[in-house]
Amino acid sequence: MIAMARILAIYRVLLDGSISSDEAIQRIRKELEDKGFKLEGYDENPIGFGIVALNLKITAPEEDGITDAISSVLEELEGVSSVELDMVSRVG
């Protein structure tokens, strides 16, 4: 049996300050896992005025439209003001 290839996608997510970054990460992790994606790690970068940018490292099956699906999950979360895909790479 051939294993399906996976991708690593790095997203930059800006939080609007209405929830803490810890709470945002918990929600992001849960929503991604519910859709079959995995949050592998993240970096937190305070920008100022209560705005925080999160650089999320997410793995998912390599499928057509998968990055759009991940973006949709992230954009629908409370406290997220913007989502930007920075990079996609095949990981296996």
Curated annotation (Swiss-Prot):
Family: Belongs to the EF-1-beta/EF-1-delta family.
SMART domains, alphabetized: EF1_GNE (SM00888)
Single GO term (MF): translation elongation factor activity
Pfam families the UniProt entry points to: EF1_GNE
Key words of the record: Elongation factor, Protein biosynthesis
Stated name of the protein: Elongation factor 1-beta
Keyword Translocase: no
Function of the protein: Promotes the exchange of GDP for GTP in EF-1-alpha/GDP, thus allowing the regeneration of EF-1-alpha/GTP that could then be used to form the ternary complex EF-1-alpha/GTP/AAtRNA.
